């Protein structure tokens, strides 16, 4: 807390000594969340017990603006209640930098941003903030943006190392990607918003003893959004090619959603996603499984995180058909989303026989209540009805009959001050 006070006072001093028009906004976020996990991410085996815990995010956000200069600093502490003693002299995770960037606006249409920053576009299927996880997701990157009226072109660049090395390391860098470049373009044609993305990610690996190489994988595609008075829809199409650990990549993704507002308070949507995969009896070394690399994957394919949240990589792919029902009433919001999952590629049992493609059904229910402007209470309950095929994919034997997950979260977002 002493460090945070010093930082805050330093920013205030900058304001008082400045000679230009300046703005400084400071706000906090405290977000404790209780979770009950009984088959979260994978079916529970008989004999295993459910678990529960409380995690918390605590953030300080500072936003600075001075004519053509903008800057943001976000510090955070992520903890599980009880991970340190009540008399601890140091925190387990300490205070970390979530965002720390500066931006210069060359003109109303051109800007450049450097530093630790969130990179998030469209529906966050490929590039997202992952706000659900307490730590979120941010990148060390440079961003150049050209944004005249009705158009935006962003060019991003990143290169990573594990330290200020004096010579080239002898072991591969595996903390993250070694390098990344992307171009994102957005425009509007009437009622259709169109985005194009080209993303190039390079991962370092040891090809042979003492021989480090970087393989590059390309993700490219489009995201379209249509909105009318009562109708809205979106369509995402992406492909992946390149190399992954010296293996060729050939994968693709398609996702679509169609929504209709029956009343001002009630909306229904139908959606479908296809993520390519590979038959388990396919001996080819080609990577055919699509990977939503930096996406906010918790928001897709069920909230119980059975797919693509640190799992289900280089697997049989996924088909997800879902119905989403939204209802709002004054300060309340309710959402019910059933998902039906299928494997688009062959799954084999222990006898190498083809199994049924049906993976299971998940039902997600969430609600939210706005206590006041800066306080939000939300909760949810999810249940997965897993098939034998899904249990096989998750390598679970003797699975229990009930797999469910429940959570309650409170978000406090008070504004400390705003100086102009």
Q: How would you name each of these model-derived features?
A:
Residues 127-131, 139:
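Asp-box/WD-like beta-propeller blade repeats and closely related beta-sheet repeat scaffolds
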Residues 200-202, 241, 273-278:
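Glycine-rich beta-alpha junction loops
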Residues 246-253, 269-317:
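C-terminal outer-membrane beta-barrel translocator/porin domains of Gram-negative envelope proteins
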Residues 7-11, 17-119, 142-148, 152-153, ...:
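Beta-barrel outer-membrane channel/assembly domains of diderm bacteria
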Residues 40-42, 85, 126, 165-169, ...:
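Outer-membrane beta-barrel and related beta-rich outer-membrane complex signature
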Residues 146, 151-235:
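Internal metal/ion-chelating core segments
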Residues 98, 138-140, 181:
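Envelope-exposed proteins and targeting segments
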Residues 1-2:
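N-terminal secretory signal peptides that target proteins for export/translocation
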